[in-house]
C-alpha cells in the first residue's frame, strides 16, 4: 500500500485487502459491519458480510491468483478511496450476468477505484469501480479480441 498515516481505518483496509488476496473469508468478513453494503459494476449489490464474501469469491474462482495492490489511498474522517491494480490469471470459469466465460489461461491487469465508508472501525459501505472492457479484453472475451 502507498505510504499513508497508519490509522485504525487504514489497518482495516489493509486487513480487508490482504484477506481478499489470500481468500481468507473469515478475516475478510470481520472487517465489515453486519449491515454492510458492497456494490460491484453490473449491478451486483451485496448486503452483509456473508453475501459480500460469496459475491467477490466469484473473482477468486475465475482468477485464483488474483491480488490487489493499493497504489494510492486517500482518507478522510470516516471515508476512504483507494486506487487498486488487480493482477491474476484466468484459470477458472468467470460467471457473469450474461453467462459463464470458460478459463483462457490469460493474465490480467485491471485498474480500479474503490470507495469506502466506515462505521466505527469497520467498513459499512464499499463501491468498486473497474473497467469491464479492460478485463474482458485481457481474457479475449470481447468481439475482435485476440
Task: Go through the PLM ranges and name each one.
Residues 1-146:
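C-terminal and inter-domain tail/linker signature
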